[in-house]
């Protein structure tokens, strides 16, 4: 999804989040463009440009993501076992920013985190399955009406 306007978009991202970052691509970006933002060499945030060709309503998607993250962080059993990602609002308090045709959001960088593109052992499969089961269990009392924008 990368394009020639990426540099100017990343400059815009810095204005909305109010810091001077050095960006580097993060992951393979199968769906979204993802960047690690460092300040003074220290990883701080992860920025994502959501793919509007895949997600028809990126604002609704971000609203739903915020609802899910809030629910998971309030679930003691889940949040004691797993690090729940933290959405970082822009300077004006928005959960994401639409600029021209791109929607950007920011996450707090989770030190030591990794994303396996391919599972290479039965232990990794078992760990992923257990984590997914915990995720499903944490959603038992999640109410779908909260998915809609008010």
Model-predicted segments: where are they?
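Juxta-kinase regulatory segment immediately upstream of eukaryotic protein kinase catalytic domains
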Residues: 1-24
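Conserved ATP-binding subdomain of kinase catalytic cores across diverse folds
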Residues: 22-150
């Amino acid at each position: 999804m990368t394009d020639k306007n990426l540099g100017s978009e990343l400059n815009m991202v810095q204005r909305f989040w109010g810091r001077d970052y050095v960006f580097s691509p993060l992951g393979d970006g199968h769906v979204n463009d993802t960047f690690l933002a460092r300040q003074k060499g220290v990883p701080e945030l992860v920025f994502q440009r959501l793919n509007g060709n895949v997600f028809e309503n990126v604002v609704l998607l971000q609203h739903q993501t915020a609802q899910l993250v809030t629910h998971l962080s309030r679930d003691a059993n889940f949040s004691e076992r797993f690090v729940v990602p933290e959405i970082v609002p822009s300077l004006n308090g928005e959960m994401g920013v639409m600029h021209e045709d791109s929607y950007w959001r920011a996450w707090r960088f989770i030190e030591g985190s990794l994303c396996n593109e391919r599972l290479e052992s039965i232990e990794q499969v078992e760990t992923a399955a257990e984590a997914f089961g915990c995720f499903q269990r944490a959603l038992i009392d999640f109410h779908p009406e909260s998915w809609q924008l008010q």
